[in-house]
A protein has these predicted regions:
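Glycine-rich ATP phosphate-binding loop
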Residues: 1-7
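AlphaC helix of the eukaryotic protein kinase fold
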Residues: 7-29
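Conserved short submotifs of the Hanks-type protein kinase catalytic core
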Residues: 45-59, 63
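Protein kinase catalytic-loop region centered on the HRD/HxD motif
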Residues: 84-94
Length: 279
Protein backbone atom coordinates (compact mmCIF):
# COMPACT_ATOMS: atom_id res chain seq x y z
CA UNK A 1 0.00 0.00 0.00
CA UNK A 2 0.94 3.64 -0.46
CA UNK A 3 -0.16 6.42 1.88
CA UNK A 4 -0.50 9.71 0.04
CA UNK A 5 -0.63 13.00 1.94
CA UNK A 6 -0.92 16.60 0.72
CA UNK A 7 2.38 18.35 0.07
CA UNK A 8 3.27 20.72 2.94
CA UNK A 9 4.26 23.28 0.30
CA UNK A 10 0.61 23.71 -0.72
CA UNK A 11 -1.28 23.45 2.56
CA UNK A 12 -2.43 27.07 2.15
CA UNK A 13 -3.63 26.51 -1.44
CA UNK A 14 -7.40 25.82 -1.38
CA UNK A 15 -7.44 24.63 -4.99
CA UNK A 16 -4.67 22.10 -4.30
CA UNK A 17 -6.42 20.75 -1.19
CA UNK A 18 -9.70 20.50 -3.10
CA UNK A 19 -8.03 18.51 -5.86
CA UNK A 20 -6.46 16.20 -3.27
CA UNK A 21 -9.86 15.56 -1.70
CA UNK A 22 -11.32 15.15 -5.17
CA UNK A 23 -8.76 12.46 -6.01
CA UNK A 24 -9.56 10.52 -2.84
CA UNK A 25 -13.30 10.77 -3.49
CA UNK A 26 -13.03 9.71 -7.14
CA UNK A 27 -10.57 6.91 -6.43
CA UNK A 28 -12.89 5.21 -3.95
CA UNK A 29 -15.77 5.23 -6.43
CA UNK A 30 -14.11 4.03 -9.61
CA UNK A 31 -13.72 0.28 -9.94
CA UNK A 32 -11.46 -0.77 -12.80
CA UNK A 33 -8.38 -2.99 -13.05
CA UNK A 34 -6.86 -0.22 -15.17
CA UNK A 35 -7.17 2.58 -12.61
CA UNK A 36 -5.06 2.55 -9.48
CA UNK A 37 -7.13 1.14 -6.61
CA UNK A 38 -7.93 3.35 -3.63
CA UNK A 39 -8.50 1.78 -0.22
CA UNK A 40 -11.09 3.10 2.23
CA UNK A 41 -9.24 4.76 5.16
CA UNK A 42 -10.25 4.31 8.82
CA UNK A 43 -13.18 6.40 10.01
CA UNK A 44 -11.25 7.86 12.93
CA UNK A 45 -8.21 9.16 11.06
CA UNK A 46 -6.72 12.33 12.52
CA UNK A 47 -4.99 13.75 9.43
CA UNK A 48 -5.66 14.13 5.73
CA UNK A 49 -4.38 11.24 3.60
CA UNK A 50 -5.52 8.57 1.18
CA UNK A 51 -4.39 4.98 0.70
CA UNK A 52 -3.79 3.31 -2.67
CA UNK A 53 -2.46 0.01 -3.88
CA UNK A 54 1.26 -0.22 -4.60
CA UNK A 55 1.99 -0.74 -8.29
CA UNK A 56 5.51 -1.99 -8.89
CA UNK A 57 6.60 -0.97 -12.35
CA UNK A 58 7.61 1.98 -14.53
CA UNK A 59 5.53 4.85 -15.77
CA UNK A 60 4.59 4.73 -19.42
CA UNK A 61 7.10 7.53 -20.01
CA UNK A 62 9.90 5.39 -18.56
CA UNK A 63 8.70 2.42 -20.61
CA UNK A 64 8.76 4.56 -23.77
CA UNK A 65 12.33 5.61 -23.04
CA UNK A 66 13.34 1.95 -22.71
CA UNK A 67 11.28 0.84 -25.74
CA UNK A 68 11.63 3.55 -28.40
CA UNK A 69 10.38 1.33 -31.24
CA UNK A 70 7.44 -0.75 -29.99
CA UNK A 71 5.43 -2.81 -32.44
CA UNK A 72 1.93 -1.65 -33.41
CA UNK A 73 0.61 -4.70 -31.55
CA UNK A 74 2.36 -3.60 -28.35
CA UNK A 75 0.98 -0.09 -28.77
CA UNK A 76 -2.56 -1.38 -29.29
CA UNK A 77 -2.28 -3.49 -26.15
CA UNK A 78 -1.23 -0.50 -24.05
CA UNK A 79 -3.80 1.86 -25.55
CA UNK A 80 -6.61 -0.65 -25.15
CA UNK A 81 -5.90 -1.04 -21.44
CA UNK A 82 -5.79 2.73 -20.91
CA UNK A 83 -9.07 3.00 -22.82
CA UNK A 84 -10.74 0.53 -20.46
CA UNK A 85 -9.72 2.71 -17.53
CA UNK A 86 -11.02 5.84 -19.25
CA UNK A 87 -14.30 4.11 -20.05
CA UNK A 88 -14.80 3.37 -16.35
CA UNK A 89 -14.43 7.09 -15.61
CA UNK A 90 -16.66 8.19 -18.47
CA UNK A 91 -19.47 5.85 -17.40
CA UNK A 92 -19.52 7.69 -14.08
CA UNK A 93 -19.67 11.02 -15.95
CA UNK A 94 -16.09 11.82 -15.06
CA UNK A 95 -13.27 13.12 -17.27
CA UNK A 96 -9.61 12.55 -16.35
CA UNK A 97 -8.36 15.82 -17.95
CA UNK A 98 -4.63 15.10 -17.47
CA UNK A 99 -3.94 11.88 -19.33
CA UNK A 100 -0.25 11.64 -20.27
CA UNK A 101 2.55 9.01 -20.15
CA UNK A 102 3.64 10.19 -16.71
CA UNK A 103 0.18 9.40 -15.33
CA UNK A 104 0.13 5.79 -16.49
CA UNK A 105 1.87 2.91 -14.69
CA UNK A 106 2.76 -0.50 -16.11
CA UNK A 107 2.79 -3.24 -13.48
CA UNK A 108 5.26 -6.10 -13.61
CA UNK A 109 2.59 -8.41 -15.04
CA UNK A 110 1.91 -5.94 -17.88
CA UNK A 111 -1.29 -4.47 -16.44
CA UNK A 112 -1.66 -0.79 -17.25
CA UNK A 113 -3.12 1.54 -14.61
CA UNK A 114 -4.11 5.20 -14.81
CA UNK A 115 -3.01 7.30 -11.83
CA UNK A 116 -3.31 10.91 -10.62
CA UNK A 117 -7.04 11.50 -10.37
CA UNK A 118 -6.70 14.95 -8.83
CA UNK A 119 -7.71 16.74 -12.03
CA UNK A 120 -10.76 14.54 -12.72
CA UNK A 121 -13.80 16.64 -13.59
CA UNK A 122 -17.10 15.34 -12.27
CA UNK A 123 -20.25 16.37 -14.05
CA UNK A 124 -22.01 18.99 -11.96
CA UNK A 125 -19.00 19.96 -9.86
CA UNK A 126 -18.71 23.28 -11.71
CA UNK A 127 -22.02 24.26 -10.10
CA UNK A 128 -20.30 24.25 -6.70
CA UNK A 129 -18.42 27.42 -5.75
CA UNK A 130 -15.03 25.88 -4.96
CA UNK A 131 -11.51 26.89 -6.11
CA UNK A 132 -11.00 23.53 -7.82
CA UNK A 133 -14.05 24.05 -10.02
CA UNK A 134 -12.84 27.49 -11.11
CA UNK A 135 -9.51 26.37 -12.53
CA UNK A 136 -8.95 26.53 -16.27
CA UNK A 137 -7.26 23.77 -18.25
CA UNK A 138 -5.82 21.30 -15.75
CA UNK A 139 -4.16 19.10 -18.36
CA UNK A 140 -0.58 19.12 -19.59
CA UNK A 141 -0.31 21.37 -22.64
CA UNK A 142 1.25 18.81 -25.02
CA UNK A 143 -1.57 16.31 -24.38
CA UNK A 144 -4.52 18.58 -23.63
CA UNK A 145 -7.22 18.85 -26.28
CA UNK A 146 -7.36 22.15 -28.19
CA UNK A 147 -10.80 23.02 -26.83
CA UNK A 148 -9.47 22.74 -23.28
CA UNK A 149 -6.60 25.09 -24.09
CA UNK A 150 -9.23 27.55 -25.31
CA UNK A 151 -10.93 27.44 -21.93
CA UNK A 152 -13.81 25.07 -22.72
CA UNK A 153 -14.77 22.37 -20.26
CA UNK A 154 -13.16 18.99 -20.77
CA UNK A 155 -15.38 16.20 -22.11
CA UNK A 156 -14.84 12.51 -22.92
CA UNK A 157 -13.78 13.70 -26.39
CA UNK A 158 -10.92 15.58 -24.72
CA UNK A 159 -9.73 12.40 -23.01
CA UNK A 160 -9.94 10.51 -26.31
CA UNK A 161 -7.74 13.19 -27.91
CA UNK A 162 -5.12 12.77 -25.16
CA UNK A 163 -5.20 8.99 -25.57
CA UNK A 164 -4.65 9.31 -29.32
CA UNK A 165 -1.70 11.65 -28.78
CA UNK A 166 -0.14 9.01 -26.54
CA UNK A 167 -0.71 6.35 -29.22
CA UNK A 168 0.92 8.63 -31.81
CA UNK A 169 3.91 9.24 -29.56
CA UNK A 170 4.33 5.54 -28.81
CA UNK A 171 4.55 4.80 -32.54
CA UNK A 172 6.78 7.69 -33.58
CA UNK A 173 8.48 9.18 -30.53
CA UNK A 174 6.99 12.52 -31.65
CA UNK A 175 3.80 14.52 -31.17
CA UNK A 176 1.21 14.94 -33.96
CA UNK A 177 1.69 18.71 -34.14
CA UNK A 178 4.95 20.63 -34.07
CA UNK A 179 3.57 22.84 -31.28
CA UNK A 180 0.85 22.45 -28.66
CA UNK A 181 -2.52 23.46 -30.22
CA UNK A 182 -2.88 26.76 -28.40
CA UNK A 183 -5.45 29.19 -29.84
CA UNK A 184 -2.72 31.57 -31.04
CA UNK A 185 -1.15 28.98 -33.36
CA UNK A 186 -3.98 26.60 -34.22
CA UNK A 187 -4.56 27.93 -37.72
CA UNK A 188 -0.93 27.36 -38.65
CA UNK A 189 -0.71 23.82 -37.32
CA UNK A 190 -0.49 20.86 -39.69
CA UNK A 191 -0.95 17.25 -38.77
CA UNK A 192 2.33 15.38 -39.21
CA UNK A 193 1.88 11.94 -40.73
CA UNK A 194 3.28 9.07 -38.66
CA UNK A 195 4.96 7.93 -41.88
CA UNK A 196 7.19 11.00 -41.80
CA UNK A 197 8.88 9.44 -38.78
CA UNK A 198 8.32 5.74 -39.52
CA UNK A 199 7.63 4.96 -43.21
CA UNK A 200 6.97 1.31 -42.34
CA UNK A 201 3.71 2.15 -40.58
CA UNK A 202 0.60 1.55 -42.72
CA UNK A 203 -1.43 4.33 -44.31
CA UNK A 204 -4.66 3.13 -42.68
CA UNK A 205 -3.12 3.48 -39.21
CA UNK A 206 -2.07 7.03 -40.05
CA UNK A 207 -5.62 7.81 -41.18
CA UNK A 208 -6.97 6.52 -37.86
CA UNK A 209 -4.62 8.70 -35.83
CA UNK A 210 -5.20 11.76 -38.00
CA UNK A 211 -8.91 11.57 -37.29
CA UNK A 212 -8.44 10.89 -33.58
CA UNK A 213 -6.24 13.97 -33.02
CA UNK A 214 -8.35 16.33 -35.10
CA UNK A 215 -8.28 19.88 -33.76
CA UNK A 216 -12.09 19.90 -33.95
CA UNK A 217 -13.86 17.68 -31.37
CA UNK A 218 -16.75 16.93 -33.74
CA UNK A 219 -14.33 15.43 -36.28
CA UNK A 220 -12.88 12.88 -33.85
CA UNK A 221 -14.14 9.41 -33.08
CA UNK A 222 -17.42 9.56 -31.14
CA UNK A 223 -16.44 6.62 -28.93
CA UNK A 224 -13.42 4.76 -27.62
CA UNK A 225 -14.63 1.51 -29.19
CA UNK A 226 -14.59 2.99 -32.71
CA UNK A 227 -11.11 4.39 -32.17
CA UNK A 228 -9.81 1.04 -30.91
CA UNK A 229 -11.41 -0.80 -33.82
CA UNK A 230 -9.71 1.39 -36.42
CA UNK A 231 -6.45 1.30 -34.47
CA UNK A 232 -6.31 -2.44 -35.11
CA UNK A 233 -8.02 -2.84 -38.49
CA UNK A 234 -8.07 -0.86 -41.75
CA UNK A 235 -11.15 1.28 -42.26
CA UNK A 236 -11.75 1.76 -46.01
CA UNK A 237 -13.82 4.86 -45.26
CA UNK A 238 -10.77 6.56 -43.75
CA UNK A 239 -7.95 5.41 -46.01
CA UNK A 240 -7.07 8.36 -48.29
CA UNK A 241 -7.61 7.61 -51.96
CA UNK A 242 -7.49 11.09 -53.47
CA UNK A 243 -4.44 12.15 -55.45
CA UNK A 244 -1.91 14.16 -53.49
CA UNK A 245 0.97 16.13 -55.03
CA UNK A 246 4.35 14.48 -54.72
CA UNK A 247 5.60 17.42 -52.66
CA UNK A 248 2.98 16.55 -50.00
CA UNK A 249 3.77 12.84 -49.99
CA UNK A 250 7.53 13.04 -49.58
CA UNK A 251 8.90 14.07 -46.16
CA UNK A 252 10.98 17.30 -46.16
CA UNK A 253 14.18 15.51 -45.15
CA UNK A 254 13.85 13.26 -48.22
CA UNK A 255 13.63 16.29 -50.47
CA UNK A 256 16.93 17.54 -49.08
CA UNK A 257 18.53 14.21 -49.92
CA UNK A 258 17.02 14.27 -53.42
CA UNK A 259 18.33 17.81 -53.96
CA UNK A 260 21.88 16.80 -52.98
CA UNK A 261 21.81 13.73 -55.24
CA UNK A 262 20.42 15.80 -58.11
CA UNK A 263 23.17 18.38 -57.67
CA UNK A 264 25.86 15.70 -57.74
CA UNK A 265 24.38 14.02 -60.83
CA UNK A 266 24.04 17.33 -62.67
CA UNK A 267 27.64 18.16 -61.86
CA UNK A 268 28.75 14.76 -63.14
CA UNK A 269 26.74 15.22 -66.34
CA UNK A 270 28.30 18.65 -66.98
CA UNK A 271 31.77 17.20 -66.40
CA UNK A 272 31.11 14.35 -68.88
CA UNK A 273 29.83 16.76 -71.52
CA UNK A 274 32.88 18.98 -71.02
CA UNK A 275 35.25 16.00 -71.26
CA UNK A 276 33.61 14.87 -74.52
CA UNK A 277 33.99 18.39 -75.90
CA UNK A 278 37.68 18.42 -75.03
CA UNK A 279 38.19 15.13 -76.86
Amino acid sequence: MIIKTPSPNFVDDPAYIDRFLNECWVGRRVNSPHIVRFIEPPQNRRCLYCVTEYVQGPTLREWMNDNPLPTPADVRNLIQQIAIGLRALHRLEMVHQDLKPENVLIARDGTVKIIDLGAVRIRGIEEIDVPWGQDGCLGTESYAAPECLEGDRATPASDRYSLAVIAYELLTGQLPYAKPPRPSVRRRLRYRSIREFNPDLPVWLDACLQRSVSLRPESRYPSLSEFLRDLGHPNPALTPTEWRPLVDRVPPENWRFIAVVSLVLNGLLIWLVWMNGVD
